Amino acid sequence: MSQQRDALSGDGDPALWSPRAWLGPQTLEALAEVNEQCLELLCEQAQAGARPAAPLLTELRALWIELDSAARRRAARCPYLLLDAGFTAPQRWAPAATREVRDQACAEPVAAFFTVPRASAVMRLVTTYAWHLASSQSAAARVLLGMSASCAQHIGTATLGYVSRLAEGHAQWLQPRWADRVMVWRDLLSTAASGEQAALERSRIRGIQLLAADARASRIM
């Protein structure tokens, strides 16, 4: 299926996140590449069968295992990051000048979702992409990553080295978006596997609606 067809809505009109829209093709292509790595990580975690495992992995294990590269590419073209790294928790990304407050927040326990070795590399990839967007396209970071304004400010004004060090020390921050909404993921994976464009588009739109609802609930937009 061509990228041109993939950028069309169910009615045959260009989607709001198509390369012709305000976000631009390079930003969206990079997002798709990051998402593909995120999906590969989820597939690997599901195959690992670690215990205790989250319902997102156990209930959808067959879908994760059967998700081939073509299906992953289709699912990866969602116009939002499929994982999160605490981009609505500004205290995690606060400057070193406020280290005491930041360290207290960072000390709060966060259960690691990912236990496979690949998680650290994906965490670095996600945070590097987040830093790039926050420092050059703050509005895009907030839309595509569900990032709060204060997080965008902290990450966008920090050095890449500082953000990378935080990421290396806190790989457990990396979590699936909507990890407790198994049906949302079931819909995305099944439609990506089928390749049915209209159904896949509806799944993407549902994700956008959820992201917007989360933003309103957190007052981050």
What are these regions (language model features)?
Residues 1-99:
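Structure-specific DNA junction-binding interface
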Residues 25, 29, 33, 110-117, ...:
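Generic amphipathic alpha-helical segments used as scaffolds and interaction surfaces in large
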Residues 45-49, 133-136, 169, 191, ...:
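Surface-exposed polar/charged interaction patches
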Residues 72, 169-211:
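Long, compositionally biased
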Residues 99-108:
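Short, charge-rich amphipathic alpha-helices with coiled-coil/heptad character
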Residues 107-125, 173-184:
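Membrane-interacting alpha-helical segments
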Residues 119-171, 175:
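Amphipathic alpha-helical packing elements
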Residues 214-221:
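Long, low-complexity acidic/proline-rich regions
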